[in-house]
């Protein structure tokens, strides 16, 4: 289950949600919607979204989550959230088919999961947050980066952690059957016989039935067309190094990235960050970790 943790931290009159999400998986949609409904009903005003281990996944699921985080008025207008940029030939093919390369914020979404269609009503799952704290690392990539890039024009986002991976592109899986059967159909439309012309490929299933390729065919931009630098990832507003071998579990207020986010959100009664931790070796040694300085911005960031 990629929806690993969901919590609400309360202090004074403030409620801040925390969601640890590890993959944009179509099977996680119902759980995501349920969590967002809970946050909405509990009156969460800000969200800490932990994407430090999220390498990406399905772009439609990313669109679904964005539609529950973006301001409700933008979702109601179906505003553009992301743009996909393909090569000119594919863009022309999309134009001729009347299809769009834009992803929109939506209050209702349809997805196909294992051949079964699902219709999700998100109208009562939009949390209504005013600020998003994104916890990231070098493992944060692809759909995770797209989510933050697409939401930036709509939402106050503070990125905490380390520079993300920098995979600002997407594509699709092409199986051997997809390729061969498409070629067979193409030949047939031209009045030709694929297997007669290529008898050596007649038994392709014997050799490559389980093969496939992941084909990159677009990069993404925000609604204004701003394109990320492919040579770099997203730089954090507040640089904090993850410490996965600390004694504190994910979700604990003393865990380094969550501690930083809660500090930035204004929580003042946090426990001390001075900890002792086990190393990876069974013959462990004690490691002293310094206290996080919540006011230290990374040099060169706004």
PLM feature spans:
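C-terminal "post-core" interaction segments
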Residues: 16-19, 23-48, 55-302
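Short beta-strand/loop segment at the start of cytosolic alpha/beta domains
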Residues: 1-20
């Amino acid at each position: 289950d990629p929806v690993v943790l969901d919590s609400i931290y309360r202090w004074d009159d403030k409620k801040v949600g925390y969601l640890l999400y590890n993959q944009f998986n179509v099977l996680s949609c119902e759980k995501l919607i349920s969590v967002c409904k809970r946050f909405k009903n509990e009156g969460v005003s800000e969200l800490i979204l932990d994407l430090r281990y999220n390498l990406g996944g399905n772009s439609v699921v990313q669109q679904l989550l964005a539609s529950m985080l973006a301001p409700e008025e933008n979702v109601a207008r179906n505003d553009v959230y992301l743009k996909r940029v393909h090569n000119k030939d594919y863009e022309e093919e999309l134009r001729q088919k009347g299809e769009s390369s834009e992803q929109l914020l939506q209050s209702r979404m349809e997805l196909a999961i294992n051949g079964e269609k699902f219709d999700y009503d998100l109208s009562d799952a939009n949390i209504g947050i005013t600020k998003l704290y994104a916890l990231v690392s070098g493992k944060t990539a692809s759909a995770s980066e797209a989510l933050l890039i697409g939401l930036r024009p709509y939402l106050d986002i503070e990125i905490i952690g380390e520079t993300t991976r920098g995979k600002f592109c997407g594509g699709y899986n092409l199986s051997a059957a997809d390729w061969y059967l498409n070629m067979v159909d193409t030949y047939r439309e031209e009045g030709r016989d694929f297997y007669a012309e290529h008898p050596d490929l007649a038994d392709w299933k014997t050799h490559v039935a389980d093969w496939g390729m992941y084909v990159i065919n677009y990069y993404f931009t925000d609604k204004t067309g701003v394109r990320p630098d492919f040579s770099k990832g997203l730089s954090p507003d507040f640089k904090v190094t993850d410490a996965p071998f600390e004694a504190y579990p994910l979700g604990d207020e003393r865990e380094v990235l969550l501690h930083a986010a809660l500090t930035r959100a204004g929580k003042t009664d946090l426990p001390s960050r001075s900890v002792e931790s086990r190393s990876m070796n069974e013959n462990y040694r004690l490691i002293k970790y310094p206290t996080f300085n919540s006011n230290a911005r990374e040099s060169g960031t706004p």
